[in-house]
Every structure is written in C-alpha cells, then in structure tokens.
Amino acid sequence: MSTTVGQVIRCKAAVAWEAGKPLVMEEVDVAPPQKMEVRLKILYTSLCHTDVYFWEAKGQNPVFPRILGHEAAGIVESVGEGVTELAPGDHVLPVFTGECKDCAHCKSEESNMCSLLRINTDRGVMINDGQSRFSINGKPIYHFVGTSTFSEYTVVHVGCVAKINPLAPLDKVCVLSCGISTGLGATLNVAKPTKGSSVAIFGLGAVGLAAAEGARIAGASRIIGVDLNASRFEQAKKFGVTEFVNPKDYSKPVQEVIAEMTDGGVDRSVECTGHIDAMISAFECVHDGWGVAVLVGVPHKEAVFKTHPMNFLNERTLKGTFFGNYKPRSDIPSVVEKYMNKELELEKFITHTLPFAEINKAFDLMLKGEGLRCIITMED
C-alpha cells in the first residue's frame, strides 16, 4: 500500500447525485489525509436506515452530490500529520461520531458526546480545512457524517477511527460501527438490567434486536418484544426475546398490557422506534420504585413527550442515549472482543451479502423492510 502514500488515489465510489435517485458508480479522486486525518481502504460496509434517511432527504438539508455510508470496516492506508496511534495496515472501524480525547465530554466518564467530533449530518467537508477529500474532474463530492464508506477509499478524522483486533473478521464486526452498538450499549451501558430481571424492547428492527441481545447477555429472564409488525416476532426469538406484544391486538394502552403481564411493570425498557407514543409507553410501562426506561429512537422534530410528573415522583427513571454511550476509540475495541470471545453473536444480524456493484439492491431491501443488515463487499 505504501506506493500510494501522499498520492491522490482514484477508486470506485457509489455517488448520490440527488435525493432518492439510485447511487451511481463513479471513478472518484481521494486526496491524501491532512493533519489528524487517516485514509482508509474500506473492505466491507453495510447499509443503515440513517443512510436511507439522508439519501431520501425528506425534512433535512439536502447535501448533494455526496458519498453516503457509515457502517464499515477497513484497513489504514496512510495517516496524516500528527497521527501517532494509527499506522498503515491497522484494522479499524470508522465511526460516525468521534472522540477527540481533549474536550470536557471526552474527559468525562459519563459522556460520549465529543464537542469536536459529535455527529454533524449537514457538514459535507473535513473540519481541518473545510474542504472535501473527494472529487470528480476537480469538482468536490461531499462527505457524509465524516465517514463516507460507500467508496473503496475514504478519509476520516483520526478521532472517528477505532483500532480493533486484527484477527476480527471485518465482514462481521463492520456492523458494530453504528446500529448494533447503539442498541447493545443502550441496554448494557444505560438500562443496565440485572440477572433475572425483565426488559421490554420497543421496536424489533436491527437496533431493537441489538438491545434485546444486550438484555440476553445481561441475563434478563423475561425479554418482551413490542412491535406493530407480527412478522418480526419469530426472528426476534434468536436474540433472546421470550414474549411478544403487538399493540394492535389490544384496546388499551400497551403500557397497561405490559404492567399486567409483569405484576406492575418491567424492570427496564428500551425504546428503539423514535415514535413519540412508543417513547411514552416505554417510560410508563416500567415498574415504580426502580424502573428505568431508555430512549434510543430519534423522534420527529415537532414531537413532544408528555407524561404525568407522578410517574417520576414514583421513582421511575427516564434516560436517553447516543451510540449506546460508547466512546468510539476507547470502547468499541472491547465490543469487538465480546464478539471474539463468543459473548456477542453478530452473524444473526447479517441477513444479506451483496457485491459493491449491486449496492442499490441493498437500498431496495431496506425500503421493503427485508432483512436486518446487508453486508456490501467492496472487493470483487
């Protein structure tokens, strides 16, 4: 790889030229990394709902043309000035949010919301110089959440790169750079269920099932899956879900249904849909005295959370979480180790595999609601 150090690399990338239109495979020029940046060779990437959301560009600032993608795994090709903890050949996961290690958030054991590198969906350039590292015929192609993994090579800030065990299979652990860690950490790091406890999971997509996986790992004895789509229930059993509730089957609020099932409420709940009614239900279904509800899903910008203050005074706790409260550089390597020592199972999240040339099929699968994670193989 050393022959490319300091040089512009021309490679294939799937470019989103405009909202909602199929990605186009293009030859792009990828500039060398600048100060505190790393250039990565992406080997595997997967598709997350966030990619689809910003590709559709409904309700946010459309930034096009851009290279989407943020769940991935690869190898360091070269490093920019000032980068000391990474070297060419290192196996890494790029992450959509970062850890500068210098700000108040990074120095706090309680936060992972880095002031410098926190996710910014509107920024299509590198923070170092306000320029893009991607171009076609000299014209810039914008970045996406600092990662842009739908390209054979990408440039990422060093603070958004987790160095991992080189023995870890990159085609499996790539899913840990976003959704799976988000759900897993919401349970293990924030809800913190104890062995033998009861947990309700609202929403049984990939993030919700990762939250269920966290409850399974923690030793919860009852894991109640809540979803409006009954076809998800069978698959959820693989992730430790023991019981299912479809709110459509009942005439009363689902929080009342769960309270009756569990002698007053579950010990913990994790909400992974982003629907405000589900968020309220997730809070109101936990037991008074000790119940903890954790919100993961991102709500509509106009949504308002309404509940009676007595629900708090009766000693219920409501928490929020971002990326499972994991610090990308410090914590994600240990999540990879959970997979390596067979504590965490990742294979069951991976339902499809496609070559890079067929990336638009991955969008079709997600739009149809088929499968959980589709791994896109960059090399033919």
From Swiss-Prot:
Enzyme class per UniProt:
oxidoreductase
**Record-listed Zn(2+) 1 binding positions:** 48, 50, 70, 178
Q: Where in the cell is it found?
A: Cytoplasm
Its main localization is cytoplasm
Q: Does the keyword Transmembrane helix apply?
A: no
Q: Which GO terms describe its molecular function?
A: alcohol dehydrogenase (NAD+) activity; S-(hydroxymethyl)glutathione dehydrogenase [NAD(P)+] activity; zinc ion binding
**Pfam families per the UniProt record, alphabetical:** ADH_N, ADH_zinc_N
**UniProt KW keywords:** Cytoplasm, Metal-binding, NAD, Oxidoreductase, Zinc
Q: Which residues bind an alcohol?
A: 50, 70
The UniProt annotation places NAD(+) binding at 50, 203-208, 227, 232, 273, 296-298, 323, 373
Q: How is the cofactor bound?
A: Binds 2 Zn(2+) ions per subunit.
What residues bind Zn(2+) 2, as annotated? 100, 103, 106, 114
Where does it sit, as one GO cellular component term? cytosol
Tell me the domain of life.
Answer: Eukaryota
One GO biological process term is:
alkaloid metabolic process
What the record says about family reads: Belongs to the zinc-containing alcohol dehydrogenase family.
Q: What is this protein called?
A: Alcohol dehydrogenase 3
This chain is encoded by the gene named ADH3
